[in-house]
């Protein structure tokens, strides 16, 4: 730290000392890749505000690298696998998920996805067990008296830590497959009549056939698909706590859910007071580019630049795919900045420059950038929205197809399927996005929506974490639906009671009418006699 930074940090600590409750202790259960990139931004902001932040890091962590210079504390715990083991697993899952997924039937695709999630669940459970069974570390954590736990909901264990340490819990989440966690643990009402099931790749304007498809997928996710091995996790949690419980029940105790999206990307749907959108919290104004890159961008003249990146998890393309992409890029008048780590394609044009890493946000914010060719990861999508850049989407896995389809529905993107990627198809998509002004106009419209918020997403995320610390939880924001059984939630008991009342009234009226009829008939007979 510089002298100036040290002085500011000491000043904050003094403020915390004289204002008890102004600063607190935050324990973090993170996950890898873009999830860590997002949550790290929140942690840095919390640390700058004087909070003591502690991150739990496994010895096999891929991106989370503890540094002495950081204002964040790191607690490293040993796990029975190495960093290379974890990297291999992620690479294998990505390969299995992306291999020809567009050509598979929807049920075969979901079957493959379930297999990937089962294996992922096993790995995360092993990481969690290594932490929970580390008695010395758990004793240290219990003695630290944390004010809040911040956890990524796609990696279970944060809810168990919150229960063991008797600490409020805040989730950071993009989504669970089929909205399973949000619905069953968070209690979020998501009617399938107009809310497309996440991963369904549908929009909110569905035809009858699409609503049938949406309903079937909702039933599949609700009653069959499991993002985590529910039975295994529930048994583990029950053994640790010494009482019967379930993963769904434990996750349902979260105080606040910070969802990494916003109404610029998301379709309208019901919300609850303990949910809030913080999509794009990592976005910021563009900084100057490195000198060499700036010179290349400026050399594009009036044609401008296209930015190409398939994210951090996809290291390179096959040689065949790389040549297909390079051939298409070589035929456009724009200069191209391509994030690529592999053998130089034979068809690479003179207008294209390869980089192992690019300052993506700064490039997207450059006035000469005309389009963004991307895989559709949420971070990249939000950087494009922030700067108002139209997208050519080549989705690969996870939330990417859904994200790209949302942008297509909003008129700010064109989708190209990876499995049938061709030079002609990519070239056509690029020309459409850059030559049709409606794509730029729609991208700018989404950008205006994103910027028109009373509080910035990052400040909102920090506010809710501090809110939970100040109030020692936020149970007053949780709906009482968590205390209802499924038949009470759907009012089946009330409907049954009312139906019984109606049947009873009809029965009594019928009996009364029959009685009156018989009475009248008997009186008639007596008069005749």
Swiss-Prot record:
Look up the record and give one Gene Ontology term from the biological process aspect.
xenobiotic metabolic process
Keywords for the protein's UniProt record, in alphabetical order: Endoplasmic reticulum, Glycoprotein, Glycosyltransferase, Membrane, Signal, Transferase, Transmembrane, Transmembrane helix
- InterPro entries, A to Z: UDP-glycosyltransferase, UDP_glucos_trans, UDP_glycos_trans_CS
State which residues carry a glycan (glycosylated): 134, 316
Membrane topology is: Single-pass membrane protein
Reported function? UDP-glucuronosyltransferase (UGT) that catalyzes phase II biotransformation reactions in which lipophilic substrates are conjugated with glucuronic acid to increase the metabolite's water solubility, thereby facilitating excretion into either the urine or bile. Essential for the elimination and detoxification of drugs, xenobiotics and endogenous compounds. Catalyzes the glucuronidation of the endogenous estrogen hormone estradiol.
Protein name as catalogued: UDP-glucuronosyltransferase 2B1
Q: Which source organism? A: Rattus norvegicus
């Amino acid at each position: 730290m510089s002298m100036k930074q040290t002085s500011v940090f000491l000043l904050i600590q003094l403020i915390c000392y004289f204002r008890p409750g102004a600063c607190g202790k935050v324990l973090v259960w993170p996950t890898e890749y873009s999830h860590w990139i997002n949550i790290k931004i929140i942690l840095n902001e919390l640390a700058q505000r004087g909070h003591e932040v502690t991150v739990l890091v496994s010895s096999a962590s891929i991106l989370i690298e503890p540094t002495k210079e950081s204002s964040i504390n790191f607690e490293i715990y040993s796990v029975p696998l190495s960093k290379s083991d974890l990297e291999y697993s992620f690479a294998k899952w990505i390969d299995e998920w992306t291999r020809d997924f567009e050509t598979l039937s929807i049920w075969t695709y979901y079957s493959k996805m379930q297999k990937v999630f089962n294996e992922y669940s096993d790995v995360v459970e092993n990481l969690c067990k290594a932490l929970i069974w580390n008695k010395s570390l758990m004793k240290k954590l219990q003695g630290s008296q944390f004010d809040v736990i911040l956890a990524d909901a796609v990696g279970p264990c944060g809810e168990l830590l919150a229960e063991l340490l008797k600490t409020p819990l805040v989730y950071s989440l993009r989504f669970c497959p089929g909205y399973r966690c949000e619905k069953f643990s968070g209690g979020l009402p998501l009617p399938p009549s107009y809310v497309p099931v996440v991963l369904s790749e549908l929009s909110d304007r569905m035809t009858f056939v699409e609503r049938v498809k949406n309903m079937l997928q909702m039933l599949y996710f609700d009653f069959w698909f499991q993002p985590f091995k529910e039975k295994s996790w529930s048994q583990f949690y029950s053994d640790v706590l010494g009482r019967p419980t379930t993963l769904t029940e434990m996750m349902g105790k979260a105080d606040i859910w910070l969802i990494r999206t916003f109404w610029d990307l998301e379709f309208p749907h019901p919300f609850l007071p303990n949910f809030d959108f913080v999509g794009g919290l990592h976005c910021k104004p563009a900084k100057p580019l490195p000198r060499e890159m700036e010179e290349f961008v400026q050399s594009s003249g009036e044609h401008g630049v296209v930015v190409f990146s398939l994210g951090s998890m996809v290291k390179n393309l096959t040689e065949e795919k790389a040549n297909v992409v390079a051939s298409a890029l070589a035929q456009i008048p724009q200069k191209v900045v391509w994030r690529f780590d592999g053998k130089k394609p034979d068809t690479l044009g003179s207008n294209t420059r390869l980089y192992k890493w690019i300052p993506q946000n700064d490039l997207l914010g450059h006035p000469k950038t005309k389009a963004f060719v991307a895989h559709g990861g949420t971070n990249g999508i939000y950087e494009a929205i922030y700067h108002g850049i139209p997208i050519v989407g080549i989705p690969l896995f996870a939330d990417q197809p859904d994200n790209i389809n949302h942008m297509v529905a909003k008129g700010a993107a064109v989708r190209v399927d990876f499995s049938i990627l061709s030079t002609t198809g990519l070239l056509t998509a690029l020309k459409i996005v850059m030559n049709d002004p409606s794509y730029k106009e729609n991208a700018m419209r989404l950008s205006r929506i994103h910027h028109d918020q009373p509080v910035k997403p990052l400040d909102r995320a920090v506010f809710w974490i501090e809110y939970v610390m100040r109030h020692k939880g936020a149970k007053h924001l949780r709906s009482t639906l968590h205390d209802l059984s499924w038949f009470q939630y759907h009012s089946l008991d009330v409907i049954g009671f009312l139906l019984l009342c109606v049947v009873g009234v009809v029965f009594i009226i019928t009996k009364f009418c029959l009685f009156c009829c018989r009475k009248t008939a008997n009186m008639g007979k007596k008069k005749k006699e």
